[in-house]
Every structure is written in C-alpha cells, then in structure tokens.
C-alpha cells in the first residue's frame, strides 16, 4: 500500500509537467521574433510549470544538486540578469533574458520535477513525433513546393539544428533497441524508418553547418558506443545515414554542391569581421542582451546582404551583448557538460543502456553547440527549450551514476502549509502578469498598424495608448504613436493651428520617451526629422537645422534607413546642393536591399541627380531597377479561389 501511494502521489506532477512543457513548446516553434504573443504564451506555461513543481514540494522539499554543470548554468543566467542593469534598451534585453534563459529555466524545471524518468519518456516521445512532422514538412517544401526546407522555422539552418537535436538521442535509443534481444522486432524497424526520415530531412536542407555537426556528433556517438554494443547495430545506423545522404544527392544534390564551398564562405566572414569591430567598442561588459541587431548597422560592411539580426556565431554574439564574463560562463557550461560526461563514462559499474543514452544526449547537445559557431541556435526558443530538457536528462543520468551530493530546500520549515500556496502564487504572478502585458501590448500594437493603414487614425491612437499603458518602456509603440500624430497633422485643415501644435508637441514627447528607453533605434530620429521638416512653422527658426541633424543621427545609427536618407537628401537639394545630395544617396546605394516598392522614391531621386550631373550609365542602372520594381508592383495580384 505504501508503494502504491508513493506512485500515485507522483503521477499528477508528471502528467502536468509533461503537458505544460509540450504546450509551451508548440507556440515556441511559431515564435520568430515579432510574434511576441507566442513567446508570452510559452513563458506563461513555463512559469505555471515552475509553480506546479514548487507547490508540490512543501512537505518533501526541493533537491538541488551540487554539480559544476548546475552551478555554471545558474551563474550564466545570473550574469544575463546582471547585464540588464547597463543595457542600452532594457525592455528588449529583459525579453531576451527569458528567451535565451529558457535553456536554464527548462533545465531547472526538469531537475526539480519529482519523477523525471516518466517526464522524460512522455516528452521525448512527443518531441520525436514532432521531429518527424517537421522533417516531412521540410521534405515536402523541397520536393513539391521547390522551396528551401525549413518547416516552421525562419531558416533551413535552424530547421536542421532542431532535427539534429532530435535525431542524435534517437540514434542512441536505436542502438539500444538493436542490442536488446528482448525488444519486439518491429521496434528497431520503426525507429530505423524514423531515423532515415530525419537524416534525409537534415541533408535535404543543404545546411553545411548542420551536416558537419551531425557527422561530428555521430562520430563521437559511434566511437564511444562501439565497445559496448554489437557491431551490427552501429553498421545499420551508419548505413541508414549513408542511404539518406545518397538519396538526397540523387533527388536534390544541393548539399554536395555547397559542402566544398564551406572554406570559401565569404558571407559569414564579412559578418564576423563587422561583428568583431562592434565587439571592440565594448568587449568587457557588452552592449546589452538582444541588442546586436540595433548596434550592428554602423559597423556593417555594405556587401553584407544578411538580415543583420545575428552575428551567425553564438559565442561571438553573446560576447558582444553580455561581455567577456557572459562568454566565459557560456563556455564554462559546455566544459562542465564535457567533464561530467568524462567522469560518468569512467564509472565501470554503469549499465550499457545508461552509457549509450548518456552519450546520445551529449551528442545531441554537441551538435547544437558545434553548429552555433556558424549560426544562432542560442536565439531559437524551441531549440533552447529542448536543449534544456536534454541537458536535464543528461545531468540526471550522470548524477545517478556519480551519486553526487545535493542540497534539500524544505519550505515547510519556513512557511506554513496554508500560507505557502498563497505566497508561491503571488510571487509567480509577477512574471506571469509581465508576459500577459507583453502579449497584449503587441496585439494592440499590431492592431494599431492595421487601423492606421485603413485610415482609422482615432482608433489607432486608442490602440497605441493601450499598448503603451501595458508596456511603457517599449519604444516601438512610442515611435509609432509619434508617426501617427505626424501623419494626423497633415490631415488637419490649414486653420487648425491649435490642434496641430498639440499633436506636434505630443509627438515630440513620444520621441523623447522612445529615445530615452532605447538610444540605438535610428527610426526615432527619422520620424523626428520628418516632424521638423513637415512643420517648419512649429519647429521655429532653426527647424531646418533640427531636421538635418535628426536625419544625420538616424543615418549614423543605421546607414540602411533609405527612407530617412531620401528625406535628408531632399532637404539638402532644397538648398541647391546637388553634389552633396547625391553623395548622401550614393552612400546608401552601397548597401544591398530586398526588392520592394518602398525603394522606388530612393532610386528615382538618385537616378535623377546622377543624370543631371552627367553620370548617365549609373543613372540608367538605377532607372532599370525602378522600372523592375514598378513592373513587379503592378503585376502583383492576390489570387482568390473562393
């Protein structure tokens, strides 16, 4: 009876924890940056998981392991929190604290959950099914839609990294099934088919970093497992991988073309060189977590045609954003995991199944860490969550073999049973309410943008006001509100001087607030410059100088702001300085831009000035681009089948 009670007591925790993790993972897969609502839902569910685990621990307490890996992870997360104090845009850094810190949060949630074996079996099975679904999506995108394989991710590289994290632990379980004579015969066959699909999908992405990480990690898995398993299982696993690679070459062939070009990857080299120049500006304490994309533009090489959001090297980017201590602590986490593996594998009494599973989990983490030298896995929420879970399982197995000491925190000695749930709920309400506000504010912000496009100025004004009340430190809302008021001034009749002045002053207040909470956003100064430029009577005698200075500051922060550059050139042109105006435009023309109709005024003005100043061939090049964009805009048609 005592045993039955013990098991029954642990079951609700396991079921709830598994459910909350999986429910949190699904919106995380859809979060790519702007979709803050998905991020908020994920974090709320993780906070609920934390609350559930803590609430169950009043009598038994929480067992905190005393290991180097747990310590390094905690110190890394603590440093991320400390770095918020000097961030140049704290509201963005706080979001990234939870974003990047999901690795540590999920690790601790797994570690503190009572029955971790059951939690792992539930979560791992669903993650494997999810991996198959995403793999099939990627294959469909390539073979049928003739697109890059990326499933729900923004890039094929992150899609491949996610599949690597699933495939390598699954490979370890496949080896165990092949060696287990008591396992049903169809189990190894089914898992073998799953692995073939995963490998095929990874190779189909033609991601060089993911492919090399897979090869490296698989080599480690095979090397460390060969002595303890029948060779038949290892050979079958390698044949599955080779068959998937050959199938990819026959059906697609892009990976074979891209792999030899790895040493000539000039695109990433350009990004790394520019990022290194940014690093030298603040190497010790960093610029603030999540602010790379805002600080990068002034250092950006014009030939860099990337989105500019990431350094494509997590270790370099975390150094830039959190300083040298952040990098050292991240590396300490990796070395602590490696040292834990070495120590555990030296235990001679360890079972074969634990040894192979432990190695497979480590190899999954190794693949993610290896690819992070050329990518940005640390900033992919779903990958960080699964990495935290895998690291938690790896840590659990190692501790079980090493019998490491732990510290038990007993809340019952400090807080009564009735007061405990009230205190826990109140404490967790703080982050939960923050995430609710974050998600709602972004929804109102998106709603305001739609309303503004539809000409509903008053409705957009109300939506932005609500968003600002929810997140007062988000500069996006403030900039959008200022721009809305700038536009509203143009809609008023000429004799409405009083209303224009009120809107003008309020717009300046919004811009002042935006500049205060985020000094890196160049768009703030573009809107300010336009406000001065369009309202000379309200700007005063020095309005022209104010507008000019605003545009200069905008371009100093982000030289690719071509709309602000066009406005700046127009001001200079009004004074008859064609050479200077063209020079301003030419500076912007050094950069690569995605084709969009918004570029037409920029290219048209530059082409006009080039022709007037005798640069006929250069003008013709831009005129051809304008014609192409105009033709593309005119030809755009949204089909409807209903």
Where are these regions (language model features)?
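Alpha-helical transmembrane segments of multi-pass inner-membrane proteins
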Residues: 2-32, 43-54, 75-84, 95-252, ...
